[in-house]
């Protein structure tokens, strides 16, 4: 089983206009600092909330796609941690996602941890990569990389696990500086883990929670290639997001930045 883990980030939508002297792509470092500050400030404003998460899992071998299954879990975002429960359970606990979904490729962090980790001070290195269009928005792009010594990205396959470096790209709306999309790639995985590479994309959209609008990673894709060349793809979507109620029972433990777990695919 392949499991991927990283950090939590969901962003409130823009509610005020920017000043006329907002940094522009001609000053990419100043613009990056404004994006970073905006992202981290919004994280602090995010209420605790819970969503129904639907995961369609597919497998490709020798060019042919096979739909494996659809997995549904309840996920709560509380204090910038992801807590999981099976549908129908009344109790959220801080437990690894592969304890809730014990078979196949699974991950957490897409709806929180990754962006929080990337925009933490002194974790990722950024490089301005120009302007363009992405997912219907006029965007500014930055590429980033997180070295091994600063990474908390955990890859777990069968009985093996390892922390790995990763890299990727961030696209923000050129007018609002709201996140549009985040892609990340894991390429340098030790051979004994049994996974050649991992890639993930997160797509952001404004959603209403508790009477206010927030920018959430409404859907994501998680792909992984194992040492046999089999490619697993998870299509993940958040539904029915709502404010987390205090009468839910929550157990806290040690937080993690994000992870991926992958078991050898079953057909």
Task: Label each region the model flagged.
Residues 1-9:
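Bacterial N-terminal signal peptides that target proteins for export
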Residues 10-21:
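Hydrophobic h-region of N-terminal signal peptides that target proteins for export
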Residues 20-167, 174-181, 185-201, 205-267:
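Structured extracytoplasmic
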């Amino acid at each position: 089983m392949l499991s991927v883990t990283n950090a939590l980030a969901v962003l409130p939508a823009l509610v005020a206009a920017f000043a006329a002297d907002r940094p522009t792509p001609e000053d990419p470092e100043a613009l990056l600092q404004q994006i970073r500050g905006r992202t981290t400030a919004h994280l602090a404003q995010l209420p605790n909330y819970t969503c129904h998460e639907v995961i369609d899992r597919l497998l490709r071998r020798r060019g042919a796609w096979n739909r494996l299954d659809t997995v549904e879990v309840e996920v709560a975002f509380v204090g910038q941690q992801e807590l999981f429960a099976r549908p129908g359970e009344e109790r959220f606990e801080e437990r690894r996602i592969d304890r809730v979904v014990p078979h196949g490729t699974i991950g957490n962090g897409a709806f929180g941890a990754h962006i929080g980790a990337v925009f933490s001070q002194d974790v990722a290195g950024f490089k301005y990569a120009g302007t363009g269009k992405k997912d219907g928005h006029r965007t500014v792009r930055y590429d980033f990389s997180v070295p091994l010594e600063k990474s908390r990205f955990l890859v777990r396959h069968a009985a093996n696990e390892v922390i790995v470096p990763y890299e990727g790209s961030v696209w923000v709306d050129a007018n609002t500086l709201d996140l549009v999309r985040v892609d990340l790639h894991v390429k340098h995985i030790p051979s004994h883990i049994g996974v050649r590479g991992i890639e993930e994309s997160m797509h952001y959209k404004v959603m209403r929670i508790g009477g206010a609008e927030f920018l959430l990673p409404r859907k994501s894709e998680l792909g992984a290639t194992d040492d046999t060349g089999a490619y697993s793809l998870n299509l993940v979507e958040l539904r029915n997001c709502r404010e987390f109620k205090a009468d839910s029972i929550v157990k806290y433990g040690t937080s993690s930045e994000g992870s991926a777990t992958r078991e050898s695919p079953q057909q």
